[in-house]
Amino acid sequence: MNYLLTVTLLLFLSPQAFAQDGKPTPIRVTDGPMLGRPASDSMTIWVRTDRQGEVNVLYGRNENKLNLSSSFRTRGAQFDYTGTVTINGLEPNTRYYYRIEDHQLDGSFRTMPSAKNFKNPNGNPEGLFNFRFEFACGNNPKGSGDSAGPTLPVFDTLNKQVREKINFAILNGDWLYETRRDYSPQEWLYQVGLNEAETPRIVQKAPTIVGVWQNYKDLLHRGRNLSEWHRHVPTYFTADDHELINDIYGAGETGYVNRRAVFRDIGTQAWFDYLGWANPTEHNIPAWFGAAKLTKGSDLLEDEDADFTKLDLDQMANLHVHWGTPTAGVPDSALDAQPGDPNSAVYEIEEILGPNKLRIKPKAKADGRPAYSIGRRCYGKFTVSNCDFFLLDTRTHRSLHNVDNPGNPKATMIGAKQLKWLKDGIRDSKSDFIFVVSSVNFMVPHVGSGGGDDKQAAIKKDDAWTVFLKEREELIEFWDGLDKSVFVLTGDLHNSFAIKITDNVYEFASGPHNSINHAPMKDEGGRPSNGKFKYGPRSCDIRWSSYAMADIPRANRTFPHYCVVQVNNVFNNPVERDGERWFAFPHPQVIFQFHDAFTGELRYSETIVQGLD
């Protein structure tokens, strides 16, 4: 798998016999630490600092004797002083404790198991092992009837009952909800100790990114139990609309003019700075931000600061000309009607004409020098034991849907290249189980806002695959022909459910962590709490779901859930007591356990056994 490489991050790994706090450090950690990229011999730690500088991590197996250390330097202001360090040389399946030097910011983690420790030539030659993970979506911390409250009670439950029992987590979209998006570059410059002449290039070209950075800091500061969770549990993430902007559609639709659509790359850049670093990515080329010279009626884009011949555009997304207003990233329906830059739209790059010149489609509408960006591809894959996980990007390449024509054969949720990557990866997989992680739902439509105030006025709402039926049905038919089970893990809708699509294909939606629940009769196509359901050409079986009746006031729809997934591959059968001798099940099992987020009580469990009719 390919991991995001932070080339500007300087690592200084320095194991010491007796690591200890030195003199007070001038660099203060303001956010984090957070854990990611778990492996059997390493773990990555993320922090943000008040200024660029060195951070030292003390760690060890004994909580009271952190005898090793690893130092690194955070990145510059263009990344909001964020950075990561990967601690290598760790023992597999082992609990480590750590603390940031000269801080009270501490945590712990367990490395992933290693196949070599479970191999048994006669009973488990491949070294399969068991593991668990938690997944859900929707961390909305807002009050006023938008959530379970700013205290984020689910994370109290997770910290007390779950974190020591799992190997990792997947936050399947909407980790972030929009706050502070109107934070100004001037406020940010003061915060980071820079004058206007020192403004980083990214802030010059995309000034509204500072509001997204502040949005992340706002949630990390107010969500102390959330921050505690991330200090102990390595997490993978998908980016959904709220990481970018609520109800963002059509970012892959050439010619589409929409304020929200063209905020994609700004939100995505901030997501990589704060969360996306933790993910494996198939393409590691970052987005390009620039200032374009456009001429009315011309299909030429010029940028004297660019060298397009050095950009591998086949590994990048399409081009957006930004809206250009200070409130471009604020989720407010009234702002959608306010004009942006006259050339703001979604563009296709037709040809590179030279280092500084592109041919684009459509043609420019006006003379101007607007800000623009060429987007980043955000999907990737990782493997744990006999399970492959495909993390999809359901927002970057999405064409404009049509609720009245959901079978449009040209409509796409993930784009042709990502679709091919997904099918090729699954076709070539040697694993027993396939997990496809989609931030949006597969069989149930998302056609209502749950009574929220902010709505996308330009198009009828449906975030789900139910308005991309050709692509969805192509995937279901492909998956159903495999000799392995496929589990589509979804989020977005603020309800949990377990759905059997075919004998081989299942959808499991988990959440919300803290957001208010949707009312299925209004927001989810009138689906039942369980039983047969058909929305579009295919019927499915809803085995169980969380549910909110339509007569419950919005502020009272607080039924948060989370799901713990347990993969049972092996059992221990030692000759002597307390020994280890692992045998692989002929038919491994995956158990999905849905829990009440307030109490941790088990609400539903579904077990799939591989290879049994």
How would you label these PLM feature ranges?
Residues M1-L5:
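Positively charged n-region of N-terminal signal peptides that target proteins for export
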Residues T6-S14:
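Bacterial N-terminal signal peptides
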Residues P15-A19:
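Sec/Tat signal peptide C-region and signal peptidase I cleavage site
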Residues D21-V85, G89-D613:
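Long, structured stretches of catalytic cores involved in phosphate-ester chemistry, encompassing
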